[in-house]
C-alpha cells in the first residue's frame, strides 16, 4: 500500500524537509490546476493524489509539532 510507505518515509524526514516537500507539492498542484483549466490535463486523478499527499505531509508536521 503506497500511503503507508509514504507516511513512513515522511515520518523519517526533518521539519525543514517536510516543509520543502509541502512547497513542492503545492507548486505541483498549482501546475495541475492550470493544466486542467487549459484542457491539457489527461490524468485528472493526479489532482486528488497530490491533495492527499499535501494532507499527509501536513499531518506528519502536526504530529511532530505535538510531540515536541
Curated annotation (Swiss-Prot):
The keyword Ribosomal protein applies. One of its GO terms (molecular function) is structural constituent of ribosome. Pfam families: Ribosomal_L29. GO terms for cellular component: cytosolic large ribosomal subunit. PROSITE patterns: RIBOSOMAL_L29 (PS00579). Keywords: Ribonucleoprotein, Ribosomal protein. One of its GO terms (biological process) is translation. Belongs to the universal ribosomal protein uL29 family. This is Large ribosomal subunit protein uL29. The gene is rpmC.
